[in-house]
Amino acid sequence: MPLNREDKQAVVAEVAAQVAKAQTVVLAEYRGIAVGDLTTLRAKAREQKVYLRVLKNTLARRAVEGTPFAPLAEQMTGPLIYGISEDAIAAAKVVHDFSKSNDKLVIKAGSYDGKVMDKAGVQALASIPSREELLSKLLFVMQAPVSGFARALAALAEKKQAEAA
């Protein structure tokens, strides 16, 4: 059932609000995907706080107008699903991971930091560890010398106690 003008304006406003908060937008062609698989993809996207939506391309073009994602409008052709995320890599990671297990979902393009990326760029973005993973690695690297120093002091204290006894 076609949308009337007010419904279209509401959809554009909703998507524009998501795009205004977003750091990344990923476009993927979903031709031939079963409904169950699409539902699985949506559930994974929700877990990662990725806004995922099948949208008419004309409405999507209107939603990205005047944003850093406007150059992406040239890529908006064919049946597309739009992944929009405030996290820099979450949308790319969700769509890329799903496309590995389902060859009917084809990554078409993406945009990050005002730059349009092709499929390889989106895959490269998806391969970057999440912020939490990077922070935990940094913490481990910073903590290792301190814990090593603490173990050395404890061993020295034990040695002094053994010599004193």
From Swiss-Prot:
Signal peptide (residue range): none
A GO molecular-function annotation: large ribosomal subunit rRNA binding
Any one GO biological process: translation
InterPro entries in the cross-refs: Ribosomal_uL10 (IPR001790), Ribosomal_uL10-like_sf (IPR043141), Ribosomal_uL10_bac (IPR022973), Ribosomal_uL10_bac_type (IPR047865)
Sorted UniProt keywords: Ribonucleoprotein, Ribosomal protein, RNA-binding, rRNA-binding
Cellular component, GO, one term: ribonucleoprotein complex
Listed Pfam families: Ribosomal_L10
Claim: RNA-binding is one of the keywords in the record: yes
Membership in a protein family: Belongs to the universal ribosomal protein uL10 family.
Subunit structure: Part of the ribosomal stalk of the 50S ribosomal subunit. The N-terminus interacts with L11 and the large rRNA to form the base of the stalk. The C-terminus forms an elongated spine to which L12 dimers bind in a sequential fashion forming a multimeric L10(L12)X complex.
Function: Forms part of the ribosomal stalk, playing a central role in the interaction of the ribosome with GTP-bound translation factors.
Protein's name in the database: Large ribosomal subunit protein uL10
Gene assigned in the entry: rplJ
